């Protein structure tokens, strides 16, 4: 117990571990050991996980070819990702799905363009009608009677018997 609390002893153990690790890593054959170990671990995991999964999938699936193809493509894509590649292997089914998706998107865009052009044509026709109604038409004489609200005003010649109805009359009242 005293040795565990001794600082010098602890430092000596750490130094011993570090020197051991450095001698292992300095060996040229051991320099790639972590990479080799990680690749072997991944391959072992894929082997242990994929074989039972493929057996079950082949027994339960009606189309075993597609299942095998999908599993192999998935394994290769995983290995490519581990190797650092951004490209992936795609099957014909995936390409067809992507093409169908692109075609649907293009159809949607074409329908939208068709709707927009129809609306624009309608707007142009509406603007033409508005312009035609707003066009200034030349007239010989402009009737201003509607504008100044004097349509029912009569001149002196038009009054009955030439009398002005608005002139005051002499009114006599009995008292």
From Swiss-Prot:
Description of post-translational modifications: The N-glycosyl content is primarily Man(9)GlcNAc, with a small amount of Man(8)GlcNAc.
InterPro entries listed in its UniProt record: Rotavirus_NSP4
Keyword annotations: Activation of host autophagy by virus, Calcium, Enterotoxin, Glycoprotein, Host endoplasmic reticulum, Host membrane, Host-virus interaction, Ion channel, Ion transport, Membrane, Metal-binding, Secreted, Signal-anchor, Toxin, Transmembrane, Transmembrane helix, Transport, Viral ion channel, Virulence
Membrane-side (Lumenal) residue stretches: 1-28
Subcellular location as annotated: Host rough endoplasmic reticulum membrane; Host membrane, Host caveola; Secreted
Residues on Cytoplasmic side: 52-175
Biological process, per Gene Ontology: monoatomic ion transmembrane transport; symbiont-mediated activation of host autophagy; viral process
Glycosylation: residue positions: 8, 18
Any matching Pfam family: Rota_NSP4
Membrane topology annotation: Single-pass type III membrane protein
Function: Plays an essential role in the virus replication cycle by acting as a viroporin. Creates a pore in the host endoplasmic reticulum and as a consequence releases Ca(2+) in the cytoplasm of infected cell. In turn, high levels of cytoplasmic calcium trigger membrane trafficking and transport of viral ER-associated proteins to viroplasms, sites of viral genome replication and immature particle assembly.
Entry note about domains: Binds 1 calcium ion per tetramer.
Record's protein name: Non-structural glycoprotein 4
Origin species: Rotavirus A (strain RVA/Equine/United States/FI-14/1980/G3P4[12]) (RV-A)
């Amino acid at each position: 117990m005293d040795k565990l609390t001794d600082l010098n002893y602890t430092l000596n153990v750490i130094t011993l571990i570090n020197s051991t690790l450095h001698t292992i890593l300095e060996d040229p054959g051991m320099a790639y050991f972590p990479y080799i170990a990680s690749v072997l671990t991944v391959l072992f995991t894929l082997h242990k996980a994929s074989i039972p999964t493929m057996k079950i999938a082949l027994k339960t699936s009606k189309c075993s070819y597609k299942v095998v193809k999908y599993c192999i493509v998935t394994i290769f894509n995983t290995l490519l990702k581990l190797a650092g590649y951004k490209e992936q292997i795609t099957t014909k089914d995936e390409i067809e799905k992507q093409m169908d998706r692109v075609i649907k998107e293009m159809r949607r865009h074409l329908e939208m363009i068709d709707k927009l052009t129809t609306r624009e044509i309608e707007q142009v026709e509406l603007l033409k009608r508005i312009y035609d109604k707003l066009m200034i038409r030349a007239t010989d004489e402009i009737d201003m009677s509607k504008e100044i609200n004097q349509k029912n005003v009569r001149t002196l010649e038009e009054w009955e018997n030439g009398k002005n109805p608005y002139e005051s009359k002499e009114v006599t009242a009995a008292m």
